Amino acid sequence: MLIGVIQRIDDKYESTRLIQLFMNERSTKHFLGLLAITIFLLFYQLVAPPNYFDFGALTKYIDYSAIILATIFCVLLTFSIFMIFRLIYIYNVPEKLQKHLIKRNDIPRNTRKAWFELFIAMLKQNNVDVLRDCYQELYDWTMSLREGRQWTVMEYPPELYEGIISVNEQLCMQQKEAVSIKNGNDIVNVMLDGVQFTIMHQNTYRTIWTCLNQQLFYKRSEWILKYWGAA
């Protein structure tokens, strides 16, 4: 079952990081652990040697301990199956997956990288609803990073720089659309700060120039003009 789920995630999002995240989810680990223990107990129940000792009132429970434990873990495994089905559903619905990835306040670096891969997959699929949420999350994230950093040099995390370059590359490669939230240079302009008054870091300059060079290579000169207008 899990092999099929992994294949489905790979086909839908083309993301190895999302597969790794799925396998590292608490529900997945609990399911695999309970499954292994339950299989072991069921097998042990068949080959367990008889008890020849008398433990008084506990003897009856010890005699049937393998059956009792196997029953308990079968019940736990049943609950775990429902949890893993819920997780599979989340990973198959992009809107829910996007919210699932950013639900924590302290989002790990690997999760952020996986989130950018989801962002790129939604660009390829032109899923406007999820893209709108992704743009908003990127804006909120950069705003939160700059909070309380007034008049100080603001360096963003490496995964943000890498993610913006990757998303910008995908945007440049796609066909132009008459009306689209993907038009314009919002993905680059999000690093510009005209409200919180932070000072731009050298890595931010470098990332912006990389994105502008990508746009120049793919003949998106109108985006470059929009950037200079915003800058």
Residues of each region from the PLM?
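Transmembrane alpha-helix detector for multi-pass membrane proteins
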Residues: 1-51, 78-88
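Binding/recognition "hotspot" determinant
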Residues: 17-22, 48-231
